[in-house]
Amino acid sequence: NTSALDVNEIAAETKRPEDVIGLHFFSPANVMRLLEIVRGDKTSKSVVASSLAVAKKIQKIAAVVGVCPGFVGNRILAQRQREANKLILEGALPWDIDDALFDFGFPMGPFAMSDLAGLDIGWNKETSNGETLRDVLCEAGRLGQKSGKGFYVYDENRNKSPDPEVEAIIKKFGEERQIQMRDINKEEILERCLYPMINEGFKILEEGMAIRASDID
């Protein structure tokens, strides 16, 4: 994953660390307007300024961020994904979670986003052992939109629909691990997905990985 790259480590291997900077686009890059400008510890102000000018030229919304795993955007989204993964094992369905977050104002929920990116990002077929739900889905050939099915099933125009097969896979996965499932309402889904994101945002500010709260927003 690009957001796992260490700009400082890359810069340390060069003779001009002050000229090294990261431009992190979000997928799909031709649609998503956000651009993270990743400044290293030794990146010069002039290089940051030039990168901001490039962002403006290509009509992107730029946010200057520091070097940390996930940078800012993916670091915060990882908190949402982690909690969403717990929720589906406790009884919420992927589309219930996605719908709750979409209705709240997100352009896409975590499982629709996973399908768009591809469930096999970072997944290794050779070492997969079925220990995670992602392992089980990938082993079943459910890689996301590109394979026609992931958490959802897709038609030829990539329109998604809830899939009873996924519901059965989740139920079986939970039962095998003796996880007690229950009904989970929309309010709990929102609280559990949003609060960790907010907390992570404050941590990012405290660490100086973002200059201002509006950059995180």
Where are these regions (language model features)?
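N-terminal glycine-rich phosphate-binding loop for ADP-containing cofactors
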Residues: 1-217
